[in-house]
């Protein structure tokens, strides 16, 4: 029998060998015997490594894991489960979750919803009432597109009846069931509030203080956008563009202009829109960043380069000559000064000039790229060299007389200068000014003096770097300390300026004229996974240490993402965004992997909408809808009024306001320029009399259709409204959506939808259907948000501030003994509870205020008709009777409970369950409600005596 068992087990393993090999590729090579014949199926004796040393084609016995690896530990099962031999199911990777993919515990190891305890409690109390069509409890739900949590399943009416007394009346049942549903909803709202009340996104919505601050911040953003729009409307930028997909470039230019204005840019910065976008960033490619400067400087300085090679071959090294084209003007001016000095005083000048040369070479190698950046960025580099000019050596002169004067100015500063030196300096300065070809301002005369600073001192100034940039006034302070020495130095420089007069204006232009800033283009990082407990301040503190950081935007959480949020971090365009992204990926915030990736630029910024929108009838309808949306949003944020921002009123107040007509209205009363005289374009016109006289009917038009009729005047009015909604309120009308928190996003005005190519003909039915359907899509903007009334929130469990304060006082009043009471807040003891009450209101007033704010916080959450909450359990949703009995798809539901309990048809009082897939035990409850009371039975006189007899 042993051989028979082995043979059976061999065949069983051989049968599933192919399936095992298909998903265990790492063991496929190990199963092949060493030296065995390739191709075809080998004999079992050759393939089996456990048959001894002679098996396997002459190879040595190999040590392989036992087949228990496939079966698992324990005794060998003769008929194993087929699941064990099947390939493992594919595990989908979640982009935003970090955990085992189960709903709980969440948020780093704790479960704020207490879903585990609730499920256990619900299983113990209602284990017999799970309907067959109900999904399993939350902890056993399959992962479907993310960890979507739901509320616990609420008992339906039939399940609730089984928990009540049999003699209860119908009215009492309905009353108790209504109370049960109300209490259930209150409990869910309260649990959700307790779970999320400490999170930033929840506070920004409902906290009495944080929500007001957030609303004021948003109102400030809108006011800034309004100012930009009015400015563009007045200068004709808005009126010169059409919201058509064929005018995409003009639309993009308008949006970019708005972004530059919102970023604080000037009209000079708008010139960047006329330039071609640069593919390579300046600071990413350092050698290429100075190409324009190098080309300009090469032409006038080529004679000087040849002269240097002839006169000073020993002093000027080949490295220094090679650095001339790419370095700033400082080194070039120094070279020009060095070349003329040795013929006059070789004994004195050469030792002084040769000393700083090795230091210059070392510093130039280290700080070459640093100097290029500073020369390209602003004119602070020249100011740094000017501040160190008074301390430089005598190597900055061209002629002997000028060099002598400069030496005296350097070393005789403490003793002062004589009057003769001052007169000579003024005379030389006047002659140099006349010799110049172009008129140079006094500020420009100092620029060659700045660039002629000693290389050694300049290198020291460059080492200071940021300190020199932060103190641009250092050159003025040096001049004040040195007295009139600056005058002598400025007199010594014009001769040098004559020799290189062509280069000096170019250098001044590069330093003084700030290039237009590319403010409408940014680099950004997308954070896929942010826990609800992470605040915006923590993200800002983490990213502010990177250069070029601008702002952070965090989206509202989504229930299908386990209330995790997404974020966008915006940087300037010139940063190395990939390096920053790599740094963020190596960091964890509150034990949460943020999942940072580089956010790509927008691909299509102007996207086409239906071309039927250009028809005159549709345009007039769109003007009405746009005007209503503009009025609602302006009134919501009080953009054109000076009053404080008010919250939406309750439903009763808003209805009364609408009935009285006291709200905003079309026409001349509005301060909004896009709404003025809007009524002139809202009146429809038709040639009704002409059609009647000529006998024209609309039947032929409906059959054949009519061509698209464009009215440019109406289109211009509509374009102003559409652009106002897009720029000010971030509402894309032709996409019937709003782009939230756009002022914090990387692209403040990124995408807009415009009218696409129009069809040749359109029927009236298509027009009417389009107008009707589009109005339904915009319903969220057309209706005002009405908060729930006081009576409505009372049904949801609203709290009273005085009642909660009283509960707070009672909770902090503890009786220790007779006439001995304790206040836990302070630890003090009192003789009576009334003294503790006074003590709490006097000494712990901030605690009482927190209780009142908490009550207002909770009530604000209840008033919101669109409040966030967990979705209802699928089992609580009403379904057709056929589906509930037979299960989804018409198939019979499983006979066992999903809660790991015994089958419902197992013994005792549960004998009535299981029939037809119903899982609630008493069979008598399967009848309709009206038949649950007082059943009239039929008693057959001929029946046996042990038959059932109804009363």
Swiss-Prot record:
Residues 387-396 have a biased composition (Low complexity). It comes from the Eukaryota. The modification Phosphoserine is found at residues 81, 302, 328, 354, 441. Residues 363-378 have a biased composition (Basic residues). Residues 328-340 have a biased composition (Acidic residues). Disulfide bonds: none annotated. Belongs to the ARS2 family. This is Serrate RNA effector molecule homolog. It comes from Drosophila persimilis.
